[in-house]
Amino acid sequence: MEIGDLVIWKGRAYVLRGLEPMSVPDRRVELEDPETGELFSAPFEEVSERSDG
C-alpha cells in the first residue's frame, strides 16, 4: 500500500493518506472518505488493498 492508493476498510473504499512506521506497535493508518473528504484513523490490520480484478 502506498499513499494515495484506494483501500478497503469496513467494506468501503477510502484514499490512504498516511501510515505509521512499521516499528510502531498497533500501527494505524489515516484514511480519507473520497465522497466527503472526512479523515479517519483506522487500525492497519483492518485495512486491505483494493483489488480491481
For the regions a language model picked out, list residue spans one by one:
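Acidic surface patches and DE-rich sequence motifs
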Residues: I8-W9, M22, D33-P34
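Short beta-strand-centered aromatic/proline hotspots
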Residues: R12-M22
